[in-house]
Each structure stands twice: as structure tokens, then as C-alpha cells.
């Protein structure tokens, strides 16, 4: 299992949006420049974040993007699903029913689920629950507590200086 680079772009971009003053938006160009990434790909990432209700686009001359929810209400899982979609990592094709040693494929019913499927789905659910338990707010607070004061001041100044 591997997430696309879009997930990383989303996390790093949203991280800095936490510091934006209220009613302040930020454009794709500024976010791309901040993170040293391509505007075109980041635009696609933000389109997905908007469709998921994580960010909101504000039209007009002073338009751009802003967070659409409180940072406590944006989980890691929300961000991943917005970018990657809600698919499961493992899809059981029930090949055990085709095994040459199986006399009757009908013995494999819901009473006898594939143990491989059960174990992997349990692991997936544990991972999803772990990702649901961490929010954008948690990420921001955890990372920023170790930032030196001059770095925090630089981020705040950058946030205030964004032209919208």
C-alpha cells in the first residue's frame, strides 16, 4: 500500500493554512511556492479537498482557499480519503473457492469467512481508526510546540503577509 504524493502535498499545505488569520484566504500559487511544489498538481489536490468539504474556495479578486472546518474536525483519515478515495487496501477475490482440493465451493459462506481477509481487514480498520484519531489541529500543535520562537514568528508574519 502506498499513498500518492498528493496526500503529502495536502498535509503540508493544510498545515500552514491553520495559521491563516480569520477571513484570510490563500491562493494555490502561494501554497505551491511555500512548499516548493508544482501549482498544477497542487490545484488538483485542492480540488479534491474542496469536494470533500475540507477547504472552501472563495471567488473573486481576494479569493483563494480557506479551511471549511475547524481543525479539530479534520482527521488524517479525512484528508487521505479526500485525495485517494475510500477504497480498501485488500480485495478478497475468494480464490479459495476455485482451489483444486475444494469439493464444494458452497462450503465457503458467511459462516466461514476467509481468514486472510478477516486479518487484513482488521488491520486496515486499526489503521483507519488511528488516522481518525489524529486531527489537523493535533498535527499543528505537536509540530509547532518544538518550533523555535523565531520560526513561529516567521510563520505568523508569512501568514499575515499573504496578499488576497
Sequence positions of predicted segments:
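Beta-hairpin "wing" of winged helix-turn-helix
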Residues: 54-62, 66-68
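Short, hydrophobic-biased segments on the C-terminal half of alpha helices
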Residues: 46-47
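Short amphipathic alpha-helical interface segments
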Residues: 13-22
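Short alpha-helical segments that sit at the start of domains
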Residues: 1-14
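A short alpha-helical element within helix-turn-helix/winged-helix DNA-binding domains
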Residues: 28-36
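Key DNA-contact positions within bacterial/archaeal DNA-binding proteins
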Residues: 40
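Alpha-helical residues within the helix-turn-helix
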Residues: 33, 50-51
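Non-DNA-binding regulatory cores of transcription-related proteins
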Residues: 70-164
